[in-house]
Regions:
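One-carbon transfer enzymes
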Residues: 1-373, 377-386, 398-402, 413, ...
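A contiguous binding-surface segment within folded domains or other stable secondary-structure elements
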Residues: 193, 199, 445-480, 485
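Recurrent small/Gly-Pro-centered beta-turn motifs in extracellular repeat architectures
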Residues: 337-339, 389-390, 437-439, 496-498, ...
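Short glycine/acidic-enriched loop and turn motifs that connect beta-strands
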Residues: 340-344, 392-395, 440-444, 499-502
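Trp- and S/T/G-rich repeat-edge/linker motifs of beta-rich repeat architectures
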Residues: 359-363, 407-412, 465-468, 518-525
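Short loop/turn segments immediately following beta-strands, especially the blade-tip
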Residues: 402-406, 456-462, 511-522
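Conserved blade-ending motifs and adjacent loop-strand segments that build the rim/top face
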Residues: 468-484, 518-542
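Blade-level signature of beta-propeller repeat domains, shared across WD40, Kelch, NHL, RCC1
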Residues: 506-512, 533-559
Length: 559
């Protein structure tokens, strides 16, 4: 018997909504798990506009404040933010055609202090529609009976890490105060501000130089939280879904930070001065220094964990070398790398050969395509060597076979097509192939944040099954693959990148504690940060084969 779809209602300030909200609503309308059956429009906007006009007429003392704020905003946009690079998630889009056949209720709310309460008659009208989920894309802080007007409550985003940031505005304080990461959650609203029942939590690297791009990144990413959780509720059923929700929210959470609000003009002025200083420092570094990816290695029996012992392999200044992956054969190490040429702004796959004494030869190109290649994940299967280089710019995950070791490789097939994926890492375990890869589901979202897991019985297939817990990690600190999965004393370890602070900041080693068709879990056991050398400011790959331990690193050197 076919399940009834979830009945969804939308809380909007009007039909003109943000681009990211429009995309989310569009996905829901096309889904097989939910129908949008009700739109609730905040009908207070015109009255608010009149109120603002009257206040301005009767309160001239605010005019200087407003003029100063406009001046500060202008200075910020011209001196600091200037060009943004991501699609504007807050661009206004009209949704009326998308929702043309949906029942609409227009309501007015009662404002008490900072919160909005619904009138009883409107609550009754909403309850008559038997809504499963109300999605908040408008209104202010909601309290009162509206919180219980849908079977599963009001689902709402808080674009901030509610452990350390409650209030708003979204993405502002993280960027202006240069926090290493920016959090976001999907929650079921309660009376406690930004402390609802969390359905999903994620972290992204903060964009220090653009509040707009900082917001756009996690707006585009977080729209998928809503659609994923609706699909999960529909598929798993109410009991199983909310059993998991209750378990994940079992601990009390204290909040000991201030309640964040819009900055005063004085605060904004101080923040702008701080950002100008940061920008001058960045421009100075870019003028006189080169932040170049290099390789570092150490030969040692056992496990080499002291990074100050690693020796540098420094490329010429017209290129960088990164993403080392290794095959050991005939007493030699074959180190496959990304060789990136600054002039062409494109990478290809190159090979460095090293003997057991650490003597190595200059790299030679082995795979070059019209598009960028990196992260040459190499592995042996049935006495043959294969490679999965990152080919994100071609929207593919490609498999190559070595036909003449080590220089000649031939394209075999696309394991996935039409996908924005990076650093695919495969692993054979329990009679299955497992693929770990970071994916960007929505254009404008970062590729650093969300790790997806797929499985297949056969390596040579484009029918990879998505894991039910996808994304299995949604955190820029621990998601993106950083090398081959390895085993020590029967324990599986997964290297991952730490992309907080900046891309390529560090890497981690996590123990895989559970891996099957229905479960995945890992525990962070070690985190590497670039603290062992004043000229090393980042590292994001680790691999080991036999005695060779190899990483890449960002080396700050004079131009």
């Amino acid at each position: 018997m076919k399940k009834n779809k979830l009945r969804v209602g939308l809380l909007l300030n009007g039909y003109n909504i943000s681009a990211w909200s429009f995309k989310m609503i569009e996905i829901i309308t096309k889904s097989d798990y939910a129908d949008i059956v009700l739109v609730i429009i905040n009908n207070k906007k015109s009255e608010l506009n009149k109120t603002i006009v009257l206040k301005l007429r009767n309160n001239f003392s605010r005019i200087p404040y407003i003029l100063i704020r406009k001046t500060l905003n202008f200075l910020y946009e011209k001196l600091i933010e200037r060009n943004t690079y991501l699609p504007d998630a807050n661009k206004e889009v009209n949704s009326e055609a998308l929702l043309t056949n949906t029942l609409t209720i227009k309501v007015k709310t009662i404002r008490k202090e900072w919160s909005d309460y619904f009138y009883k008659d409107d609550i009754l009208r909403i309850k008559e529609q038997n809504i499963d989920i109300l999605v908040r894309c408008g209104f202010g802080i909601l309290r009162g009976d509206i919180l219980n007007s849908a079977k599963y409550g009001i689902w709402s985003f808080h674009h901030g890490d509610n452990y350390i940031n409650r209030g708003g505005p979204p993405g502002f304080w993280e960027s202006m105060e240069s926090w290493p990461e920016t959090g976001s959650i999907l929650q079921i609203l309660t009376e406690d501000l930004d402390n609802g029942k969390v359905l999903c939590r994620s972290f992204a690297c903060t964009n220090f130089m653009s509040v707009t791009d900082n917001r756009s990144n996690y707006f585009w990413k977080s729209l998928s939280f809503m659609t994923r959780k609706m699909r999960e509720l529909y598929s798993a059923g109410e009991d199983e879904f909310f059993k998991k929700v209750e378990y994940n929210n079992r601990h009390p959470i204290f909040y000991s930070e201030r309640l964040y609000v819009n900055p005063t003009n004085y605060e904004l002025a101080k923040l702008i001065v701080r950002k100008i200083k940061e920008k001058i420092s960045i421009l100075y570094d870019n003028k006189f220094y080169l932040n170049q990816w290099i390789l570092m290695f150490h030969l040692k029996n056992g496990f080499s964990s002291s990074l100050w012992r690693y020796k540098k392999i420094i490329p010429p200044k017209d290129k960088f070398w990164a993403d080392p992956h290794v095959i050991f054969r005939n007493d030699k190490y074959y180190i496959f790398i990304e060789e990136y040429m600054y002039k062409s702004q494109k990478g290809h796959i190159a090979l460095i050969t090293m003997d057991e004494d650490g003597v190595y030869h200059k790299p030679e190109t082995v795979i070059d395509r019209p598009y960028h290649l990196s992260y040459p994940f190499v592995f042996e299967y049935e006495n043959k060597y294969y490679m999965i280089p990152e080919s994100k710019s071609n929207k593919t995950i490609e498999l190559y076979k070595c036909v003449e070791f080590p220089q000649k490789w031939e394209f075999q097939m696309n394991l996935m097509d039409n996908v924005r994926a990076v650093d695919a890492t495969v692993f054979y375990h329990k009679n299955k192939w497992w693929m770990f890869t970071n994916i960007c589901e929505n254009e404008g979202a970062s590729l650093w944040d969300e790790l997806f897991l797929f499985s297949a019985n056969n390596l040579f297939t484009n029918n990879w099954q998505s894991h039910p817990l996808n994304p299995i990690v949604s955190d820029c600190k621990t998601s993106r693959p950083a090398g081959k999965i390895f085993s020590i004393n029967g324990i599986l370890y997964r290297p991952s990148q730490n992309c907080s602070t900046r891309y390529g900041y560090g890497f981690n080693i996590s123990e895989i504690t559970s891996l099957d068709e229905n479960n995945y879990a890992e525990v962070l056991v070690s985190s590497v940060k670039p603290n062992w050398d004043k000229n090393i400011i980042g590292t994001h790959t680790f691999n080991r084969v036999n005695s060779l331990h190899i990483i890449d690193a960002i080396y700050k050197r004079r131009k």
